[in-house]
């Protein structure tokens, strides 16, 4: 029992940064740097996301789960009542500083507080 009690602070220390990292990444992002395209991404701290992209007459939506690993945020869309046909199945966004870069490398999802150009 004493060994278990002694290891609890270590377990809390090791578990802390992973949870903090995920909650630090959570937030409201806007796509920047792509002409005539509107897109927003909301990463919720509970691991859920909401996303949309509008380009001309094309409107795409998705919601589902997100996770961060290997320098990327992975969005996995799910069919829901509100979004029966998601705009993608899986989307991998590369983490660059505090921005999230789409696979084609054009534009980046940024949070307004981080956008200081």
Residue ranges, per PLM feature:
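Lipid interaction determinants
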Residues: 9, 16-117
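Positively charged n-region of N-terminal signal peptides that target proteins for export
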Residues: 1-4
């Amino acid at each position: 029992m004493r060994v278990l009690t002694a290891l609890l602070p270590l377990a809390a220390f090791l578990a802390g940064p992973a949870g903090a990292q995920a909650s630090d990444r959570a937030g409201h992002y806007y796509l920047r740097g792509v002409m005539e395209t509107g897109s927003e991404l909301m990463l919720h701290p509970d691991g859920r996301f909401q996303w949309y992209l509008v380009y001309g007459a094309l409107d795409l939506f998705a919601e589902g789960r997100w996770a961060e690993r290997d320098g990327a945020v992975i969005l996995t869309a799910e069919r829901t009542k509100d979004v029966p046909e998601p705009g993608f199945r899986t989307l991998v966004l590369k983490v660059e500083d505090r921005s999230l870069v789409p696979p084609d490398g054009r534009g980046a999802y940024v949070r307004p507080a981080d956008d200081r150009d």
